[in-house]
């Protein structure tokens, strides 16, 4: 008999003792069952209470979110149905599974989601996090007033201080307005004076709208288009919108056009205002909004026929301003010293913003600040140094929004230091900045029409710029601005406002674009500030010599083609003409290299090694062919980062040049311009390239005088070869790409050319009847006489 069977028999045996033991066990079993039942009831009650609390939480969350959404002009959320199915599942599950499921649910309160109208997907949690921050921006209090003005007026001016949220929010409200209209949906364009702002703001707005950058929200800058057929909101540089107008004169694809940062008065913005003023007369459905960060908006209102003004105050804190008692001899040295002192001595937390004039200065300052802070030892707080200028790639530009390093255990404060060009004055807002260092300088374009010289010069900023810079310190809490100039200089030497770019620029590109737009009467074009007649005449003269305009001032077929290239007229002419010299492939590469930042890196601590590396690429005939050698070597070395580092070459510049070259190639293909090369073994390989350079730059030539200095042809300016040239001799005739005004007059990026090429390629310009007397004229006279007597059968 089995043990189990015997046990069963034993339990049935009629023994009092045994029976009593069995009854006790039964009672224990019953009690256990009862306890478990009570536990289940208690668990169920607790679960019900938790679920009720969960419902209440969800209800409160939905109510607060709906209030937020309604204030944002979005539809409120509906009650989630998923909760009911979850509760049914709870009751069907065992105690353990119900408890674990509920615990997971309670740990993360799910927010009922509404559908993103652009993607037809539920909004992500990040969308709601960003929306809460958006609703705190000062501009949100004015949404109803803005919408009312937008509906009732065709154009108006909006003044909003930097940080008010106008650049990110206003275009989104315009998208809402356009979507509410019946009929075909037109897009919204928002122009920016700087490419960095166009890219970074587009990324931010794409995040706010919960869409992918390049889809519903995109950007367009020179040589880079991040948009698609789905794009309804496009941020772009002002020059790119002007370029779009060439092929779409009434800008039909847009229902609202916003000119942001109009106070900067860039060349393209001023031209756009004139163009748009005419377009709104022909398109009653187009809305134009002019946005400015400064309060002198009256001029814009008058220009746009006394249109309305909407003013949105920023949320600023007081800023304490400090001046230097004496002028600083070396503002870069003073700026670096000030950064170190603030980092070491200031007991308040807060980041620093240092304004400098350009990439070289910024890179140098970043290196020196890092080195000096590292030398101070581990007791000093950590520092994160971030450069900011227009040619940085987008991912590096975004670093300005990173948090500062944390405090050390000894209490030393970690800080972020942003070293920027004047882009950080108004175009971008960097939260966390408490200390601003302002040396008082910026690079500005300056043009002298008499000698046809345009240069970027380091000049003193205006009072308006100084005020904008100081205001960056009071964004989040009271701040301090250290002006590295005297109070007297601020009050008596600085101009009130920055001089409009149109009054200090070469207008060759502008006139070519206006002609392409069909605007022939330049004298009566409605400029907000008309340029000097001499500047306009010089531009017309340049385009006539380049054969872009005929003698009547009308656009030629060549000129129309030149206008399609996003290049200066001389470069555009050179690219097109290179086809006739069988060297368009090489000229494309040179043009691309001239269109990007300097490719040669020359660190302070390794100047000799950098110079030696540069000479490995040097071409005997000059700098243009040296750039070609660099590009060819870069491609032959498979675009290697390490190769660039080893050869002191800026990898970013070469990659940008490669991108520019591809885009220019596509434009050439569109016009069926052949891309070809002379056989490399031919003696004409480099000669043809140099001749093609002359087709564009015959007006930028210098002749070596007997005295040993160069004289620019026709304008008779005494100049020297720039120290950066690879030319190891002084050619008698040189073509130059750039006239640089510093302590001396330099010509930069030079190539050795033959004088006979000048008179053959540009006979109209080298007409000796109106040539000033000089050695160059005498030599050219002899060459022309020889050519006319057919002593030179070919050149």
Curated annotation (Swiss-Prot):
There is a cross-link at residue 786 (Glycyl lysine isopeptide (Lys-Gly) (interchain with G-Cter in SUMO2)). Its EC number is 3.6.4.13. One of its GO terms (biological process) is positive regulation of canonical NF-kappaB signal transduction. It comes from the Eukaryota. A motif (DEAH box) lies at residues 260-263. ATP binds at residues 160-167. One of its GO terms (molecular function) is double-stranded RNA binding. The modification N6-acetyllysine is found at residue 488. Residues 1-108 are annotated as: Disordered. Its main location: nucleus. GO terms for cellular component: nuclear speck; nucleolus; U12-type spliceosomal complex; U2-type post-mRNA release spliceosomal complex. Residues 20-62 have a biased composition (Basic and acidic residues). Residues 79-108 have a biased composition (Low complexity). Residues 147-313 form the Helicase ATP-binding domain. The modification Phosphoserine is found at residue 15. PROSITE patterns: DEAH_ATP_HELICASE, HELICASE_ATP_BIND_1, HELICASE_CTER. InterPro entries: DEAD-box_helicase_OB_fold, DEAD/DEAH_box_helicase_dom, DHX15_DEXHc, DNA/RNA_helicase_DEAH_CS, HA2_WH, Helicase-assoc_dom, Helicase_ATP-bd, Helicase_C-like. Residues 338-518 form the Helicase C-terminal domain. It is an enzyme of class 3 (hydrolase). It holds the Pfam family Helicase_C. ATPase activity is enhanced upon binding to G-patch domain-containing proteins. G-patch domain-containing proteins act like a brace that tethers mobile sections of DHX15 together, stabilizing a functional conformation with high RNA affinity, thereby promoting the ATPase activity. Keywords: Acetylation, ATP-binding, Helicase, Hydrolase, Immunity, Innate immunity, Isopeptide bond, mRNA processing, mRNA splicing, Nucleotide-binding, Nucleus, Phosphoprotein, RNA-binding, Ubl conjugation. RNA helicase involved in mRNA processing and antiviral innate immunity. Pre-mRNA processing factor involved in disassembly of spliceosomes after the release of mature mRNA. In cooperation with TFIP11 seem to be involved in the transition of the U2, U5 and U6 snRNP-containing IL complex to the snRNP-free IS complex leading to efficient debranching and turnover of excised introns. Plays a key role in antiviral innate immunity by promoting both MAVS-dependent signaling and NLRP6 inflammasome. Component of the U11/U12 snRNPs that are part of the U12-type spliceosome. Identified in the Intron Large spliceosome complex (IL, also named intron lariat spliceosome), a post-mRNA release spliceosomal complex containing the excised intron, U2, U5 and U6 snRNPs, and splicing factors; the association may be transient. The IL complex exists in two distinct conformations, one with the DHX15 (ILS2) and one without (ILS1). Interacts with TFIP11 (via G-patch domain); indicative for a recruitment to the IL complex. Interacts with SSB/La. This is ATP-dependent RNA helicase DHX15. It comes from Pongo abelii. The gene is DHX15.
């Amino acid at each position: 008999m089995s043990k189990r069977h015997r046990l069963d028999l034993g339990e049935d045996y009629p023994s009092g003792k045994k029976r009593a033991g069995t009854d006790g066990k039964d009672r224990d079993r019953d009690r256990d069952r009862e306890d478990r039942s009570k536990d289940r009831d208690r668990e169920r009650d607790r679960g019900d209470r938790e679920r009720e609390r969960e419902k209440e939480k969800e209800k409160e969350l939905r109510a607060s979110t709906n209030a937020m959404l309604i204030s944002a002009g979005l539809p409120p959320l509906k009650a989630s149905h998923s909760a009911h199915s979850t509760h049914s599942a709870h009751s069907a599950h065992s105690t353990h599974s119900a408890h674990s499921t509920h615990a997971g649910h309670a740990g993360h309160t799910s927010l009922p989601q509404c559908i993103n109208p652009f993607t037809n997907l539920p909004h992500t949690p990040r969308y709601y996090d960003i929306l809460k921050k958006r609703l705190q921006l000062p501009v949100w209090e004015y949404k109803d007033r803005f919408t009312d003005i937008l509906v009732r007026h065709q154009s108006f001016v909006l003044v909003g201080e930097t940080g008010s949220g106008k650049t990110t929010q206003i275009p989104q409200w315009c998208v809402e307005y356009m979507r509410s209209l019946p009929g075909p949906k037109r897009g919204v364009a928002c122009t920016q004076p700087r490419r960095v702002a166009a890219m970074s703001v587009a990324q931010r707005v794409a995040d706010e709208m919960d869409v992918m950058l390049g889809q519903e929200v995109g950007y367009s800058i020179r040589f880079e288009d991040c948009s698609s057929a789905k794009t309804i909101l496009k941020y772009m540089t002002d020059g790119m919108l002007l370029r779009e107008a060439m092929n779409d004169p009434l800008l039909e694809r847009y229902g609202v056009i916003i000119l942001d940062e109009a106070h900067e008065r860039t060349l393209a913005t001023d031209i756009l205002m004139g163009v748009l003023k005419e377009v709104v007369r022909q398109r009653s459905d187009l809305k134009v909004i002019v946005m400015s960060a400064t309060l002198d908006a009256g001029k814009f209102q008058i220009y746009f026929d006394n249109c309305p003004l909407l003013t949105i105050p920023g949320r600023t804190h007081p800023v304490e301003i400090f001046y230097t008692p004496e002028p600083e001899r070396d503002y870069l040295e003073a700026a670096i010293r000030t950064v170190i002192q603030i980092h070491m001595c200031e007991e308040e937390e807060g980041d620093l913003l240092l304004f400098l004039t350009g990439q070289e200065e910024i890179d140098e300052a970043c290196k020196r600040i890092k080195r000096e802070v590292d030398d101070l030892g581990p007791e000093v707080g950590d520092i994160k140094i971030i450069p900011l200028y227009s040619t940085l790639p987008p991912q590096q530009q975004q670093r300005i929004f990173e948090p500062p390093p944390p405090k050390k255990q000894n209490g030393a404060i970690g800080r972020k230091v942003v070293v920027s060009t004047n882009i950080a004055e108004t175009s971008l807002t960097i939260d966390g900045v408490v200390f601003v260092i302002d040396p008082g300088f910026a690079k500005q374009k300056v043009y002298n029409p008499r000698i046809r010289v345009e240069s970027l010069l380091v000049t003193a900023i205006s009072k308006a710029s100084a005020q904008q810079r100081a205001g960056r310190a009071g964004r989040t809490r009271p701040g301090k601005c250290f002006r590295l100039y005297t109070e007297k200089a601020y009050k008596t030497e600085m101009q009130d406002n920055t001089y409009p770019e149109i009054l200090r620029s070469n207008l060759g590109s502008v006139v070519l674009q206006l002609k392409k737009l069909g605007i022939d009467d330049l004298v009566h074009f409605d400029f907000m500030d008309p340029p000097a007649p001499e500047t306009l005449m010089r531009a017309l003269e340049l385009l006539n010599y380049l054969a872009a305009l005929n003698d009547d001032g009308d656009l030629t077929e060549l000129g129309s083609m030149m206008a399609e290239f996003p290049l200066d007229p001389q470069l555009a002419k050179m690219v097109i003409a290179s086809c006739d010299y069988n060297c368009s492939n090489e000229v494309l590469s040179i043009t691309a290299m001239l269109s990007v930042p300097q490719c040669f890196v020359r660190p302070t601590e390794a100047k000799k090694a950098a110079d030696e590396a540069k000479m490995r690429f040097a071409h005997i005939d000059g700098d243009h062919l040296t750039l070609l050698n660099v590009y060819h070597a870069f491609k032959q070395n498979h675009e290697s980062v390490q190769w660039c580092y080893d050869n002191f070459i800026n990898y970013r510049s070469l990659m940008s040049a490669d991108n520019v070259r591809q885009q220019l190639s596509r434009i050439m293909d569109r016009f069926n311009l052949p891309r070809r090369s002379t056989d490399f073994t031919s003696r004409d390989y480099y000669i043809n390239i140099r001749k093609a350079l002359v087709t564009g730059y015959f007006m930028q030539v210098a002749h070596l005088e007997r005295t040993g200095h160069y004289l620019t042809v026709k304008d008779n300016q005494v100049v020297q070869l720039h120290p950066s040239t690879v030319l190891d001799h002084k050619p008698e005739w040189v073509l130059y790409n750039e006239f640089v005004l510093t302590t001396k007059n330099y010509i930069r990026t030079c190539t050795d050319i033959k004088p006979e090429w000048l008179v053959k390629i540009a006979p109209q310009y080298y007409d000796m009847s109106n040539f000033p007397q000089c050695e160059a004229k005498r030599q050219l006279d002899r060459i022309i006489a020889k050519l006319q007597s057919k002593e030179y059968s070919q050149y």
